Amino acid sequence: MSFVDGVNSWFSAASYWDGLGPTNVVQPEDDLAFVSQFEEVESAYDNLVKNGMIAPRRKNSFASSVNNPFSTSALSEALNGSVSMSHVPSSGLLKSTLSSTPTAGSNLLGTSPAEPASGLVGSSGFGSSMLGSSLPGNATSNFGSQASTSLLHPRRSTTSLLSSSAHHSRSSYYDLATPTRSSFSYNTVGAASLPSGGLSNLSSSLRSSSKSAGFSLFESASNSFTPSSFIESANMESLSIPSRRRPSSIAPIGTRPSRKEIAFSNSSTPTDQTLRPPNPPAANGNATPVTAVNNVSAVADSPQSTGSSVSSSLPTLSLDFKQEYSGNNHDMSGLSSSLSKSHNSTSALSSQIWSSPCASTLGGVNVW
C-alpha cells in the first residue's frame, strides 16, 4: 500500500479522520438511534424554553449521568426544576401524587428507595396526597413495582413530560396520577379501602374535566397501562423535533425528484381535478369518452332539452371546441362547423349533433 493510497484512505469520506482506513465506517443503524433520541429531547426542550413554556434548567444537569437524558436525575430535574406549574389549573395534583409516600414517589421515577426523595416534586408528606390521608397496605409496593417498568418508558419519558406539561395542562398528569393505569388491583385500592375524603382534595375542574373517563378509580377492577396515552396526550405536532438523519435519505447533488406522471383513465370519472382535452379517437372510430372540457358553461345536459340556453351558449361551445381540439382538426372540424352553422335551429342542432358520424366521440360526455 503506497503512501498516496494511505493518504487517500485517510481522508476518504467513508472513514474517520484518525487514519484507520475504511474499516471504521459509521454504520447508520448502530449508535445513531440514541443520538437522535438525545437530539429530540434537547431540541424539544430548547423549543419550550424559547417559547417561554418552561424555565431554563441549570447548567450541567445531564453531566452527572454521563449524558443520559433518560436517567433518574434528568427526570427528576425535568419535573422539579424545569416544569413551571403556574399555568396548570390544579397545580398541586402532580406534586401531591408523586409525594404521597416516599416509596411510591421514588419508585414512580424508577429510583431505588434508598435515594432521598427530596429531589422529587413537592414534599414527602402525607398531607395533601391524591388518595387521601393514607394509602392501603401494599399500595406503595404495587405502585412502585409495576409503575417503574410500565409507566415511564425510556424512549418517551422526557419528551412526554416536557411537551405535555406545556401544551396539555391536565392530560399527562392524569396518566401519571391515575392509579388504574398502572394495574392497581381491586382489593388493593377499592371503594371500601379508600378513605372517606379521598376525592375531597381534587378540584372541581379536575373532576368535571373532559378526561374523567381515565379517572375510573372505583369502577375498573384492573386496567393495564397503555403507553400510547403518552403520545396521545403530548402535542407533538407543535414541537420542532428533527427526524433521524440518515445518509441514505440525502439525494446526490445534481439530481431532481422524478416527475409525477398523471394517470389518464378512460372511465367517465376524471382522475384529477385539472380539466384536460380527451384522448384522440381510436382507429376504428370508437373514441374514448371525453373526461372534461374547459370553459364550457351552461350547455344542455341531454339532446332532449330545448330552449334559449342552448342557443345562447352554442357560440361559446363551438369556440371552445375549436380551441380544445386544435390538435385534432381531422376529427372535430366538421363538428365545430356544424355547431356554428346551426345554432339558430334547435331541431337542426339536435339532428346534426346526435346523429352525426362524430356521435361516438360525444357518447358519454358529461359537460358542466
UniProtKB/Swiss-Prot annotation:
One GO BP: cellular response to heat
Region (Disordered): 237-287
GO cellular component: cytosol
Bias (Polar residues) ranges: 264-276
UniProt biased composition (Low complexity): 238-253
Domain of life: Eukaryota
The protein's name: Uncharacterized protein C17D1.05
